[in-house]
Amino acid sequence: MANYTKTTIGKENRIELHEKLSLTDAEISLNELPAGANVPFVHSHKENEEIYGILSGNGKAIIDGEEISLSTGDWLKIAPAAKRQFFASDISGITYICIQVKENSLEHFTAEDAVIG
């Protein structure tokens, strides 16, 4: 049995990779909002922090009532309890990756966990 899982994804507005890659400790989704669209709900989490990377486009996030502008290349970490909602700009859509992991669960960073050779 291989020590990896590979998948190919199509063009969808939201793709969750936990099932496609058999993820055990992370949720990763690829998301695309067309111009003028938004995530239709405000949400927070019980234990999981979220890391967002803006792959293309422009928009904004409202986090605990604060409006944050987003554009290609921006990265954002949001604590579990923060209430959040995402919006594409009226002119262009926004494509982003969301990585969700349990807050404070990482015990070792790459250099400490790597086995060379």
Residue ranges of each PLM-predicted region?
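Short strand-coil-strand connectors
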Residues: T24, I62-E66
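Histidine-centered metal-chelating micro-motifs
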Residues: N38-V39, K60, L76, P80-F86
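Short acidic-glycine-tyrosine-enriched beta hairpin
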Residues: G65-P80
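Ligand-binding loop in jelly-roll beta-barrel domains
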Residues: P80-L106
